[in-house]
């Protein structure tokens, strides 16, 4: 069993570590003496991300030697330290590879190119903002953190499988751009950002009793939707932002439950917009990462 030393707190790094654990890696997580701040931010998420790992507490400011010893026993190191911080603590790839030259070292860093100062402190919203993925309202989900964690786990899994070794960076800024790659590509192609919510076929509408999300990306679904709500005249206006107001008027007078039933019956990609409490009842966090290993008994 390959062993991973996780030098990470909060979200992206621990997510990668948990995914690796599900793939059969042994994960040893190093936390500061006060523990991972996620313990206080969300005890539930801390448990989800770190259950099954062996956790050790080390004060890197005064006892980096303990981490170097753990690194000598590991096949891979996963870290979210800024490069300057890893160097200052003596746990950089350069330092750890002195004793373990065949080490896999994957670092989730902030910035990897010339897009911004390399060591600038940032979080999910900052990376998304620089990638053109933040509108007037802040993003509600931490998609960049999740993307970076997935990429880090995939990188370590792939390197271990093919016997590769060395240092690899996963820049959060690039993960943010990857999350937004469709819009970046549409802009490069000179085409409108059709999934921005400005167009009638892909947005959120109010109805009696709540809201619904319409995702009629394919023309056949837009046509099916227009016929179902009695507005065949809107079929040619799929790419007309002004048609959104017409749809708003129609759906505002319809019951959300009836709309959901209509969508299911006619096979239209329209669903209710649940609040966080309704979503929690359907998707308990404790179960979300169970079974990502296809060999797991939990998937059978």
Protein language model regions, located:
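Active-site-adjacent beta-strand anchor residues
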Residues: 6, 79, 171, 214-216
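Glycine-rich beta-alpha junction loops
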Residues: 34, 110-112, 172-179, 209, ...
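Aromatic-enriched alpha-helical interface/lid elements that frame and gate functional surfaces
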Residues: 200-272, 276-278
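Substrate-binding/catalytic subdomain of NAD(P)-dependent oxidoreductase enzymes
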Residues: 141, 147, 159-192
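Active-site-adjacent capping/gating segments
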Residues: 39-46, 191-192, 198, 274-300
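Nucleotide donor/acceptor-binding cores
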Residues: 2, 166, 210
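N-terminal helix-loop segment corresponding to the beta1-alpha1 unit
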Residues: 1-162, 296-300
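Glycine-/small-residue-rich "gating" segment that lines the acyl/pantetheine channel
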Residues: 130-140, 189-200
């Amino acid at each position: 069993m390959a062993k991973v030393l996780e030098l990470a707190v909060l979200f992206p790094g621990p997510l990668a570590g948990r995914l690796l654990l599900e793939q059969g890696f042994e994960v040893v997580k190093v936390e500061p003496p006060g523990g991972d701040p996620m313990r206080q931010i969300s005890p539930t998420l801390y448990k989800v991300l770190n259950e099954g790992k062996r956790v050790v507490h080390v004060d890197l400011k005064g006892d980096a030697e303990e981490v170097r010893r753990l690194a000598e026993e590991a096949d891979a190191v996963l870290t979210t330290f800024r490069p300057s911080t890893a160097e200052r603590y003596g746990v950089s790839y350069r330092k750890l590879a002195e004793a373990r030259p065949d080490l896999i070292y994957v670092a989730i860093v902030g910035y990897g190119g010339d897009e911004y100062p390399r060591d600038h402190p940032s979080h999910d919203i900052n990376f998304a903002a620089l990638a053109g993925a933040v509108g007037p309202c802040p993003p509600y989900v931490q998609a960049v953190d999740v993307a970076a964690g997935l990429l880090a786990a995939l990188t370590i899994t792939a390197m271990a499988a093919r016997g590769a070794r060395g240092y690899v960076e996963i820049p959060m800024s690039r993960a943010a751009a990857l999350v937004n790659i469709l819009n970046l590509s549409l802009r490069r192609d000179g085409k409108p950002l059709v999934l921005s919510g400005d167009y009638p076929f892909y947005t959120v509408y109010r109805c009696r009793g709540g809201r619904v999300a319409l995702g009629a990306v394919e023309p056949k679904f837009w046509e099916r939707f227009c016929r179902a709500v009695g507005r065949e005249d809107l079929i040619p206006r799929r790419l007309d932002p002004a048609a959104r107001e017409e749809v708003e008027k129609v759906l505002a007078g319809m019951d959300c439950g009836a709309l959901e039933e209509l969508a299911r019956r006619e096979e239209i990609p329209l669903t209710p917009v649940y609040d966080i409490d309704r979503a929690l009842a359907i998707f308990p966090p404790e179960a979300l990462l169970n079974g990502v290993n296809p060999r797991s008994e939990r998937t059978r």
